[in-house]
Amino acid sequence: MIIFGVDPGFGILGYGVLSVSGNSFQHVSHGTIQTEKQQNIALRLKVLYEELSNVIDNFKPSEIAMEKLFFSRNITTAISVGEARGIVLLLAAQRNIPVFEYTPHEIKKAVTGSGKASKKDVQQMIKILLNLKELPKPDDAADGLAIAWCHCAVRNITRRFS
């Protein structure tokens, strides 16, 4: 089973791909999709849609995990992240891929054991948990992996108690 984790963003969208077999999670890929600030909003959304569509079609995930939108003091940022989330949800719906959402607190707790962990702590734990040679970079891609890991961990716990 392939799990696709998404850290939604308008300027930079991070993703992480894990393969799940039983209780084992293996790193497959991670990366980012970036848009240019100078481009108009419609063109940036088109770039996100087309590039993310290609990535999803390449990895063919069974499930998508995404960070929940949390209240932001910067309303413009919250709106643009919401637009990026809409693209993820649309692509998933078009492919009949279920989407699961997690708060930043849930993700940090699943990866590090603490819901108050720093980004650096999350990166370091993802490196250890997935036996990566280097810290996953950039932060957005590391967050995508952390979101995928969180979903895998929740799936395993849920499966055990079913």
Swiss-Prot record:
The keyword Transmembrane does not apply. InterPro entries: RNaseH-like_sf, RNaseH_sf, X-over_junc_endoDNase_RuvC. GO terms for biological process: DNA recombination; DNA repair. Keywords: Cytoplasm, DNA damage, DNA recombination, DNA repair, DNA-binding, Endonuclease, Hydrolase, Magnesium, Metal-binding, Nuclease. Mg(2+) 1 binds at residues 7, 140. Its EC number is 3.1.21.10. It is found in: Cytoplasm. It is an enzyme of class 3 (hydrolase). Binds 2 Mg(2+) ion per subunit. Its cofactor is Mg(2+). One of its GO terms (molecular function) is magnesium ion binding. Mg(2+) 2 binds at residue 67. GO terms for cellular component: cytoplasm; Holliday junction resolvase complex. It catalyses: Endonucleolytic cleavage at a junction such as a reciprocal single-stranded crossover between two homologous DNA duplexes (Holliday junction). Disulfide bonds: none annotated. It comes from the Bacteria. The keyword Magnesium applies. The active site is at residues 7, 67, 140. Homodimer which binds Holliday junction (HJ) DNA. The HJ becomes 2-fold symmetrical on binding to RuvC with unstacked arms; it has a different conformation from HJ DNA in complex with RuvA. In the full resolvosome a probable DNA-RuvA(4)-RuvB(12)-RuvC(2) complex forms which resolves the HJ. Belongs to the RuvC family. The RuvA-RuvB-RuvC complex processes Holliday junction (HJ) DNA during genetic recombination and DNA repair. Endonuclease that resolves HJ intermediates. Cleaves cruciform DNA by making single-stranded nicks across the HJ at symmetrical positions within the homologous arms, yielding a 5'-phosphate and a 3'-hydroxyl group; requires a central core of homology in the junction. The consensus cleavage sequence is 5'-(A/T)TT(C/G)-3'. Cleavage occurs on the 3'-side of the TT dinucleotide at the point of strand exchange. This is Crossover junction endodeoxyribonuclease RuvC. It comes from Pseudothermotoga lettingae (strain ATCC BAA-301 / DSM 14385 / NBRC 107922 / TMO). The gene is ruvC.
